[in-house]
Amino acid sequence: MFNKLMEVLMSFNLPRIRNKSELQHHTNKQSYVDDVFNNFFNEIASFSYPTHYNNKILSPRTDITENESEYHLEVELPGVTQDNIDLKIDSNILTIDGKKEQSTEKKDHNYHMKERYYGSFSRSISLPSNVDEEHVTANFKDGILSIKIPKKEQSKAKKIKIS
């Protein structure tokens, strides 16, 4: 647990003190350390569950709507290419897997902030029993994966004659 915390701490660009004047607004070294940790925990709190910063597992944001004939999902995948998306449906579980490739990191630049995520992502969504798994369609445009899942025709109750 401690190692994971240290790994997360090291992944942030903590402020570096270059000279004593940078500490003037702090009353002592402890107030500087308090500020560093407060900033760290505020940044951690800003991440929404289930996104995990240290291993960069992402869960794309999704809107799900329905009408009389189908379910419609819109999944935000900014910066992801269509070739890096895998979509499957099995036993009424829709799974979206993929990878967001990292652009070349600038070795000769010092980052002041680095908020963009890279790496693998996965999202599984349980679907109702009335979906037609054989006729699912998907389209990817402008960073939005649009998935249409038709509903099966509901079987109508038949009256049974009792003899």
From Swiss-Prot:
Instruction: Describe the location of the sHSP domain by residue ranges.
Output: 53-163
Q: Which UniProt keywords apply?
A: Plasmid, Stress response
Keyword Metal-binding present in the record's keywords: the answer is: no
The answer to whether UniProt assigns keyword Translocase to this entry is: no
What family does the Swiss-Prot or TrEMBL record give for this protein?
Answer: Belongs to the small heat shock protein (HSP20) family.
Name of protein: Small heat shock protein C4
Against Gene3D superfamilies, the record matches this protein to: 2.60.40.790
One Pfam entry for this protein is: HSP20
Cross-referenced SUPFAM superfamilies: HSP20-like chaperones (SSF49764)
**Cited PROSITE patterns:** SHSP
Q: Which organism is it from?
A: Rickettsia felis (strain ATCC VR-1525 / URRWXCal2) (Rickettsia azadi)
